[in-house]
């Protein structure tokens, strides 16, 4: 009787796992974007942005490299990502470009000026990767890269 209970419990667990796996797999495989974008990689290289220092940066200078675009904020719970981004920059800078766009769009977590942001990033995280001026990343005024 004891073995019967153990075997029944084992098969019950397998059936529950199988049902859960099937549900998750089928649900995820059916997810499709609900928007259509006219954006393509060629149009990316036609964009530009103003660096945190005030210089115009043409994105065509990034051709031939992988580009990681990330919105950042100094008072965000993910602020320590600057360490990871700087690590990636140092390790892969010959083939990876990191573009940091400070944004105050989410919970007002980037209240400082561009000067404050640059000082914070350099003094606390030694950021050397490309940073841009504070930018909207959502809404009508968002930068075209977003």
Located regions from the model:
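Hydrophobic membrane-insertion alpha-helices, especially the h-region
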Residues: 5-19
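Hydrophobic single-pass membrane-insertion segments
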Residues: 16-28
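Amphipathic alpha-helical repeat scaffolds
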Residues: 51, 71-75
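Structural microenvironment flanking redox-active thiols in thiol-disulfide oxidoreductases
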Residues: 78-143
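N-terminal hydrophobic targeting signals that begin at the initiator methionine
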Residues: 1-2
């Amino acid at each position: 009787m004891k073995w019967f209970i153990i075997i029944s419990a084992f098969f019950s667990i397998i059936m529950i796992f199988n049902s859960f796996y099937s549900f998750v797999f089928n649900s995820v495989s059916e997810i499709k974007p609900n928007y259509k974008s006219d954006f393509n990689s060629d149009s990316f290289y036609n964009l530009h942005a103003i660096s945190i220092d005030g210089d115009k940066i043409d994105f065509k200078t990034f051709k031939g490299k992988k580009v990681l675009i990330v919105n950042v904020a100094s008072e965000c719970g993910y602020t320590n990502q600057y360490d990871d981004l700087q690590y990636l920059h140092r390790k892969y800078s010959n083939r990876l470009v990191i573009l940091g766009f400070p944004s105050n769009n989410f919970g007002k977590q980037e209240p400082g000026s561009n000067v404050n942001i640059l000082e914070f990033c350099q003094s606390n995280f030694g950021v050397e990767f490309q940073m841009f001026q504070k930018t909207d990343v959502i809404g009508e005024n968002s930068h075209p890269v977003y």
